């Protein structure tokens, strides 16, 4: 059987609200689990009134708590928007609560306009070229903690959180 996954943006239907959109996402994840889907992904989008998945790790916690077997992942977290340590702590927490079920997809674009990026308080002068170093830093936080390690993700160190590089191709 070909493994199938769901990518959900948690759309807010006209006349509805974000809370209902997130409840609908949980219903969709439960259906995907019952149908034997392999993974359920949510994507990070900011400042978009029609999408409720901006706080992706929080939304994934809701989905993971309401399902039992399906893998849950970010498809993806836009790495330029976040410090690698914070991502490691968030997804380390998810992995500690739901062992063997958490995936982390990373994107290299900010995925938002400059006004929104500024509101997220990230360095607007950071280069996309920082992506490889940020990925390596993030992966380091998931390695087993070594004596004398100055900074650790707790939870995070030594946990199995597969990291995926997301992207798109132009045809």
What are these regions (language model features)?
Residues 4-8, 40-42, 72-75, 102-106, ...:
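Hydrophobic faces of well-ordered beta-strands that scaffold small-molecule active sites
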């Amino acid at each position: 059987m070909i493994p199938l996954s769901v990518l959900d943006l948690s759309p807010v239907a006209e006349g509805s609200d974000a809370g209902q959109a997130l409840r609908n996402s949980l219903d969709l994840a439960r259906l995907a689990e019952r149908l034997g889907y392999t993974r359920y992904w949510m994507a990070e989008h900011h400042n978009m009134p029609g999408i409720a998945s901006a706080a992706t790790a929080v939304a994934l916690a809701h989905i993971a708590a309401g399902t039992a077997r399906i893998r849950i992942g970010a498809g993806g977290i836009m790495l330029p928007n976040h410090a690698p340590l914070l991502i490691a702590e968030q997804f380390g927490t998810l992995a500690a609560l739901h062992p063997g079920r958490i995936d982390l997809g990373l994107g290299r674009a900010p995925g938002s306009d400059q006004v929104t990026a500024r509101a997220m308080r990230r360095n607007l002068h950071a280069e996309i070229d920082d992506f490889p170093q940020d990925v390596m830093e993030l992966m380091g936080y998931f390695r087993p903690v070594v004596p004398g390690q100055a900074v650790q993700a707790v939870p995070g160190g030594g946990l199995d959180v597969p990291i995926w590089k997301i992207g798109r191709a132009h045809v």
